Amino acid sequence: MSERFSFDLHASDGKARTGVIHTPRGGVRTPAFMPVGTAATVKAMMPESVRATGADILLGNTYHLMLRPTAERIDRLGGLHRFMNWDRPILTDSGGFQVMSLAGLRKLTEKGVTFKSHIDGSKHELTPERSMEIQRLLGSDIVMCFDECPALPADRDRIAESMRLSMRWAERSREAFGDRPGHALFGIMQGGLEQDLREESAQALRSVGFDGYAVGGLAVGEGQAAMFDCLDYAPGFLPEDKPRYLMGVGKPDDIVGAVKRGIDMMDCVLPSRSGRTGQVFTRHGVLNIKNARHMDDPRPLDEACTCPACRNYSRAYLHHVFRSQEIISSMLLTWHNLHYFQEIMQGMREAIAGGTFEAWEAAFHAGRAQGDIEPL
């Protein structure tokens, strides 16, 4: 393990890259998918189960944790790693995205954002300085600077104004973060779908200097084609020798397309949220376990999968426990989905290292186009 934060790039194939992010709590193999532990837990999963899926790092949510149980309480109890029993790296978001999503419950100024809690209506203020303090109290390994993320579509003037505010907040975040060996601060590029604004944002962030860089403001309603158009150029504005993180993505084909365009890290609630609602990701696309076609099917969700749900249980059983609203349904389907997402990441890492990413991508899309296996 490294005592400092660093990033080693091991191989590339086209724009796709593979390497390792080194932290005092262990390495993160890239490209990496980060399961989301919103309130200090990946819903329906034990920490050791999350690790067993192949995850090297989790994401925690500053907004939710600052409200309940509070960052100060987590700090008194030994920090987020001890609190949730996860001894690997943790990345925390800044809270900005969730606060900006509150719409009528928040007020935006140059200083920061004041908002009302969705839990009890209490009033709070989140600024770049307060966000850095909260993430320090949590003990995050990777800290995200505070930013504003406008929903798309939005007009150019609104996007430009928002991006420049985020860049001023990035400078304040950098200053408030200070020098913390072993911990990293990532800047967040904004600019919507405007190439020149993305470049301006990247230049502003590079002039400040960060340990890694995120592409923010995507997967917020613009659609996959527009997102990929932006990713065709945006990662190229960022330093080659630093990790690149696409926030809030996503679906399996979004993940593969992002890695193809030079992204190293991603996060999304999709695999865990979908598991709780009966949506299952497999090599042959998405299936809905509540459908009656699975009622008498003795086969696993995916015959090539080695997760506990596929090794030990039939579609018929998983259909039954889902329809019966048994808690084990959420546990098994979430485990399967997270395992599948990590298998995608491992497949891409191996393909990039071997110079066969294009062939791997073609096989990935062919499998999904094939569709789920026919019912018995």
Swiss-Prot record:
Pathway: tRNA modification; tRNA-queuosine biosynthesis
A single BP term in Gene Ontology: tRNA-guanine transglycosylation
Primary enzyme class: transferase
Domain of life from the UniProt record: Bacteria
Annotated GO CC locations: cytosol
Cofactor: Zn(2+)
Alphabetized UniProt keyword annotations: Glycosyltransferase, Metal-binding, Queuosine biosynthesis, Transferase, tRNA processing, Zinc
Biological function: Catalyzes the base-exchange of a guanine (G) residue with the queuine precursor 7-aminomethyl-7-deazaguanine (PreQ1) at position 34 (anticodon wobble position) in tRNAs with GU(N) anticodons (tRNA-Asp, -Asn, -His and -Tyr). Catalysis occurs through a double-displacement mechanism. The nucleophile active site attacks the C1' of nucleotide 34 to detach the guanine base from the RNA, forming a covalent enzyme-RNA intermediate. The proton acceptor active site deprotonates the incoming PreQ1, allowing a nucleophilic attack on the C1' of the ribose to form the product.
InterPro entries, per database record: ArchSynthase1/Queuine_TRR, TGT, TGT-like_sf, tRNA_ribo_trans-like
Protein name: Queuine tRNA-ribosyltransferase
Gene name per UniProt: tgt
GO molecular function: metal ion binding; tRNA-guanosine(34) queuine transglycosylase activity
Binding site for Zn(2+): 305, 307, 310, 336
Catalytic activity annotation: 7-aminomethyl-7-carbaguanine + guanosine(34) in tRNA = 7-aminomethyl-7-carbaguanosine(34) in tRNA + guanine
Subunit structure: Homodimer. Within each dimer, one monomer is responsible for RNA recognition and catalysis, while the other monomer binds to the replacement base PreQ1.
Chain sites annotated for binding substrate: 93-97, 147, 190, 217
Native species: Ruegeria pomeroyi (strain ATCC 700808 / DSM 15171 / DSS-3)
RNA binding as annotated region, ranges: 248-254
